[in-house]
Amino acid sequence: MAFSGALTLTDLNDYLGPSQACIKPVQAADVPSQDHSDVSALAASASTHIAIDHDGAYYESSTPPSSSLSAADSRPRQRTKLETAQISLNDCLACSGCVTSAESVLITMQSQDEMRRAIAELNQSNANKLVVASISTQSLASLSAKYTFQHPQPSSSRSASTSTLPLRVLLHRISYFLKTVFGFDHVYDTTFARHIALKEHQREFFQRRENARKRAKLSNAPADDDDRLHPDQVDGPTLPMLASACPGWICYAEKTHGELLPYISTTKSPQQVAGVIAKRFLPERLGLLAPSAPDQPSIYHVTVMPCYDKKLEASRPDFYDDITGTKEVDCVLTTGELDKLMLDEAFDICTPVPGEQEAIQESIAELSLQQAFNTPNPDVGSASVSMMPRLPRLPQLLDQPGSSSGGYLFLLMRAVWLDWISVHWDSLPLSVREQGILPKLDVRVIRTTDFTEFVLRAPTQLVEPCNDDTSQSSILFRGAQCYGFRNLQNLVRKLQKQTGVRNTRGAAARLVDADGNAIGAAAARNRASSAKARARGRGGMMRRARAGAAAVVKSSPLNPDAEAVDVTQLQLSTAHEEDERGYDYVEVMACPSGCVNGGGQIRPPTQSDVDVTRSSTTVDNHATDPEGYTKGGWAADQAGDHDGLELMLNKTCSNKTSAVPDEADEEKEVRGWQGTSKEWVRRVEEAYWQDSSVAQTRVTVAAVNRAVDQGGANDSGSSTPTLVGSGANTPLSSSNAKSIRVEDHQRLLESLAVSNAERAQRTRVVKLGGDAMAYADVLAELVVNELCLLAAPAGDALALDSARDKLFRTQYRAVQDEAVNGLAVQW
């Protein structure tokens, strides 16, 4: 089985080959002796031997004391067969021992071989079975990038829409492969599960924000009020909130920074939400979990993910389904493993499959809600499922504005903006409401685009002051995208400074209770540290230095002193306001560039792949690049004929057109996992957004922003909402590497635009295909409510909320140092 460069360490001198010598041995209790006359003498004279038989079995044999040797010689020695230790990912302590000892042994429980074995076992049984697969869009994008490179489009058909293999086509072909070869019943992408996870993420964020506002009100209450509660007596977690969809980040936080666990979102990842749909919703709709069912069905759920750490996430004991008696996700395959599986079965994903066009047209056809909910599902191909289900058609490849790592930050930013709009809509001028309104958005790239801050500001000059607790500040939301382990270190320091918590290493677990709240004396210390941090005025000197420098640059030549003072005060006030605000939310991912560059993704082509592509590609009279593509395609954006290829092959090259600043050079050196590069990640990113309707829509933000800013100066500092994107295939120029991606910014601004037409469209008839996102909202609410009613049949509001939290929430626990360094292992 092949592993990515993210897990394979070849340059360590303490590397050990895979073996059964595990770091977590099986413990066995000693049997008490029946003869207590002289236990010490017997222990001193007796001995135990462990022998290996010819069949590889282990046997324990006991040698009697020397006083009874004559009697022992007359009878055969007693032997006891020892049980073989079974080690799986359930036994993972997150100690990093598998990296240098037994990587293959631990991963065997989550591999294509295990999937083959499990499906073969299901096929041999006579019980009802349901086999479901969930495929991530990042995996589809990686496959699209690979096979588009290996099978370039002819020059006559080259266009933006045909330059890559469409994700919808890939999804249908993979679905055909899994159903015909392995007998899968349903194959979905994870976008609908992600949609439910995002809705739950939004629900949790507003709960935390409400808790934060309650604590703020209690802090501002008069001190002589005897009935005043302490702010820390408000139940529930508060802000900032950190993303929890990345298992690598969760593993790192549990091992190293247990003090941050109360701030990590408890919402399940899209993979685990897909498991809830596969193990709860689908069987219930298919009638497999009905009381009249003859026996318990066998449900097997496989996911295809861009990350090896998703295997660890699926193996967590928290994700065990008590109803079905199985895990929410039984097996996780990486993108590379799925690709190898198709190659082993001689399946050509570039060849159309029977009924492809009809199936794709049917998937995008406009259907009313009644038709979409009551159409018999054609995906049921297993003979064991005999009933005609009324399974709603799940939407495919939902276009979620935001990043290619899930769009968590952008979703919350939009939700906060729409919440502000709903409160202040009637107070806005009629001309602004008709034309459209956008917030002020500050985007700041910190060193590289893998650490980007977003500050959402309300256009306060258009709204009369109100009495809510948010009117004191124009900042509605402050968040960040933090990708890569190097940026995680900076993020942790920022969060510790903002919250006042400390890294207590071994005592990390004692800071967090079962619900993720700080407890005991450690909680008191954290409160004191947080108060001191707020009193210090975090980052004052650094901010003032930068503000002063900016003021000198922006001084007016006619009156430099007055202008410099005005700009300095403005920027000082803005910096102080942002610093006091802190982060509301951070989208954290452990991989550089996010999930499209996960450790389980397909690696870039090697030199041999390039040579094969060159020799197999027919070249016409037009000029071609080194990859065999006609110039003007993907390679047209590169600095020279060979630069794109050299970047993709992870080799150094020189820019032939323009000098690159030092900051851009530093950005170019930032690579993903071993064997990949920024250029290849960019191609996967382009494949991910190729069908994005938001990215293909041009919005002239500058005109709208001027309407918002009339009557007042733009006080948003480094606000950049005047960028206009040119589609999903707009490249990130190497000469401007520290700027925000234009297409990312375009998608964000498009999702934030609100007008009367936008509000009127919300009352129209919802149809699948016509507006997949609106249909997904309705279906997501239906799925969540139905699952909650199944878990809490009484229908009580508190019981339904508790059932919802149990279905879509989880908890995290700090790992103490003793478990990490092996001292907790009992030999």
UniProtKB/Swiss-Prot annotation:
The Swiss-Prot or TrEMBL record annotates one GO molecular function as: iron-sulfur cluster binding
A Pfam family name for this chain? Fe_hyd_lg_C
Q: What's in the keyword line of the UniProt record?
A: 4Fe-4S, Iron, Iron-sulfur, Metal-binding
NAD as a keyword of this entry, yes or no, is no
Q: Which residues bind [4Fe-4S] cluster 2?
A: C246, C307, C591, C595
Annotated Gene Ontology cellular component terms: cytosolic [4Fe-4S] assembly targeting complex
Q: Where is [4Fe-4S] cluster 1 bound in this sequence?
A: C22, C92, C95, C98
User: Per the record, where are the segments of Low complexity compositional bias?
Assistant: 61-73
Q: Where is this region: Disordered?
A: 57-77, 209-231, 599-637, 709-739
Query: What is this protein's name?
Result: Cytosolic Fe-S cluster assembly factor NAR1
What's the source species' lineage?
Eukaryota, Fungi, Dikarya, Basidiomycota, Ustilaginomycotina
Name the gene for this chain.
NAR1
